[in-house]
């Protein structure tokens, strides 16, 4: 099995401007992500960015980069532009790794690619168990429920499944049936081409979760429990400080 990792790295960020170039132990954040992807055994790693400064930083680190349009509405649209420009075939496996995950375990990058290769779904992703009620009720922690074969039934910012009997008594404890979705995806390139041809769905606009477009149009998403739990991603200056601390002490 071979696969390509594409790392969308948008320069603009309301909470952390220039995020892909944030320095972490002497390297731009996006370069750390690129290194994790290479460690996974990917045949090819491409950073997709809308900013020439990110392009320069990746090239200086010896990486491959595609300068994309700046008007994409999502990382998946940016991914689709790269797929078309590089001429990937419909059966090629593409893994989308977020550009703000410098601590992502390389093992789960390979895991999601292998899961897709073994599945008939056009798309695969990962999740981890939720262990605290705080996380279960946090709308920023996206929950996913699956069917018996590991295909997604729904993703939500709400607490799903709703434990009616337990929560009628107390919301301080939870059972072991909650999963938090991780923002890593594997697709067949042809699936991405179909995805971007679909109009946005009502559900994704309500929840602000673009993967709901896939379920809306009747397609399957394979979900597995990740072999390793990723550490914090970088959305804020506080996140960046935590990641710098973790990497400085490795």
Swiss-Prot record:
It comes from the Bacteria. It is an enzyme of class 2 (transferase). One of its GO terms (molecular function) is 3-deoxy-manno-octulosonate cytidylyltransferase activity. InterPro entries: Cytidylyl_trans (IPR003329), KdsB (IPR004528), Nucleotide-diphossugar_trans (IPR029044). The keyword Ribosomal protein does not apply. It catalyses: 3-deoxy-alpha-D-manno-oct-2-ulosonate + CTP = CMP-3-deoxy-beta-D-manno-octulosonate + diphosphate. Gene3D superfamilies: Spore Coat Polysaccharide Biosynthesis Protein SpsA, Chain A. Keywords: Cytoplasm, Lipopolysaccharide biosynthesis, Nucleotidyltransferase, Transferase. Activates KDO (a required 8-carbon sugar) for incorporation into bacterial lipopolysaccharide in Gram-negative bacteria. NCBIfam families: kdsB, PRK05450.1-3, PRK05450.1-5, PRK13368.1. This is 3-deoxy-manno-octulosonate cytidylyltransferase.
